[in-house]
Amino acid sequence: MERTFLMIKPDGVQRNLVGEIIQRFETKGFTLVGLKMMQVSSELAEKHYAVHKERPFFRSLVDFITSSPVVAMVWQGEGVIASARKIIGATNPLNAEPGTIRGDFGISVGRNLIHGSDGPDTAKDEVSLWFSDAELANWTPAITPWVVE
């Protein structure tokens, strides 16, 4: 079963959107298999955003992610990576469709509420960066037969 990493960023936590964001993925029928609220260290933030290390916004991105707690999550389900990207919306909230998380709640690209893995390889790397195997639950919700064939 496919898994993806999602992180509600400090702005989403501070704006009390954690429940609303989680609900969107639960309602879709995906399974939450890992969840933790945490203060991100600079070391973890730098590893997570290493692909942006040479970009001019790297330091401000690391500073933002470490400024306040985040909610790190692992979700599981058929097509969860692509579907999560659609639920999240475009990186720039001003370009995000209404009905998406960023389209409904975001205003600024620097405060776009949530991060989601962009593909299977990234998802695998991000899940293992943020969670140990022991922190992930292997379970099947009772509703699964009502969601997927």
UniProtKB/Swiss-Prot annotation:
What Pfam family is a match, any one? Answer: NDK
Which residue stretches, if any, does this entry annotate as coiled coil?
Answer: none
Primary localisation category: cytoplasm
Q: Name one GO molecular function term.
A: ATP binding
Extract the SMART domains matched here: NDK
Q: Give the protein's cofactors.
A: Mg(2+)
* Keyword Cytoplasm listed: yes
Known catalysed reaction(s)? a 2'-deoxyribonucleoside 5'-diphosphate + ATP = a 2'-deoxyribonucleoside 5'-triphosphate + ADP; a ribonucleoside 5'-diphosphate + ATP = a ribonucleoside 5'-triphosphate + ADP
Q: What is its EC number?
A: 2.7.4.6
Instruction: List, alphabetically, the InterPro entries matched.
Output: NDK-like_dom, NDK-like_dom_sf, Nucleoside_diP_kinase, Nucleoside_diP_kinase_AS
Location of the protein in the cell = Cytoplasm
Gene Ontology, cellular component aspect: cytoplasm
Q: Where does ATP bind?
A: 9, 57, 85, 91, 102, 112
**Is the Aminoacyl-tRNA synthetase keyword given for this protein?**
no
* Residues at the active site: 115
Q: Which UniProt keywords apply?
A: ATP-binding, Cytoplasm, Kinase, Magnesium, Metal-binding, Nucleotide metabolism, Nucleotide-binding, Phosphoprotein, Transferase
Q: Which domain of life is it from?
A: Bacteria
A biological process term (GO) from this entry: CTP biosynthetic process
Query: What does the record give as the function of this protein?
Result: Major role in the synthesis of nucleoside triphosphates other than ATP. The ATP gamma phosphate is transferred to the NDP beta phosphate via a ping-pong mechanism, using a phosphorylated active-site intermediate.
Q: Which family does it belong to?
A: Belongs to the NDK family.
Q: Which HAMAP family match?
A: NDP_kinase
**Subunit structure, briefly?**
Homotetramer.
Fetch the PANTHER family from UniProt.
Answer: NUCLEOSIDE DIPHOSPHATE KINASE (PTHR11349)
The protein here is known as Nucleoside diphosphate kinase
